[in-house]
């Protein structure tokens, strides 16, 4: 590739990232560490990179220090790892600064990881995004050799979603603009929080989500993992969506898929579940009360975004509610999040925070109310839990029973105030 082309692209990209308008994500990065941004397609990995660039500029760095390169640019064809070195050389011919590297979709270049390792060995700061189809596998993390922090990039939180829609969440929001916030929640609940959806008319959102799923399915799953039985994978995804509130063992999922006339082995299902998680379509949580083998083989599976889950549901409300709670808890607690099933059925349990959470669309039916309260009182006794919470669609109260307080909170309020509701009681 010619030097003059590379130099012009470096300058063009600098002008672009300096001026682009952003919706600030609630993600804060250290200026002293190297990062790989991972997540679902269109979750905002590149925009998080732009956000970090603009943060560095506000901190006093010059735009000339920024070496941002978008390897998906149509003007870049058949780049080699030697071209990566040439990009560095061209930058050094333009500027006397020590660059901060932002390599967007760099996985397109074969052996890119060798270049990334070399940069970190030379003490450069490096930020990387990449396609799930070629990058989000365990071998890449191993290849990078612990030199990078893996930053998970999720779709918008509800607070970020409101910010994208120019709705301010002030300290007194519950009294000032609660009606506007509740009205906006419906879209977020059914269509999810992928950033680009904010630019799309409501009538077209489902089609956009369907297109995204198909690109992820064929590009990140079928092609990346050389899956020959794509119909079996589709059936598995649909069955996971239908079972989103319940534990699903490997054997059960294998039997369910096979019952449709598509024969798959348990080992194949295990592989497929691993692939689905690697491409960020789903995530799983384990049963805290299970023995080690059962923790792995009988998990609960949730979708990374409500909009994608809703593609597969007919009566979606109860599943979407629990899925949205799962997403928010997963973002906050990561591997500390469990469910608890052992003579008690508790939807979510975070032992490090002494917290148990039930999810119920409504407590108006007496049987439902009794079931949810009883489960929390039992786990409070068995595991000495002192923070008890029921998340509903739109109901709120404080229940006091057997000397325990159980907060009942609507989902839209909990999403905006969960820090205080979860940990400061």
Regions found by a protein language model. Give the residues of each.
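Conserved lysine of the Walker
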Residues: 45-46
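Pre-Walker A adenine-sensing motif
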Residues: 13-32
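Accessory nucleic acid-recognition modules appended to NTPase machines
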Residues: 65, 199-356, 361
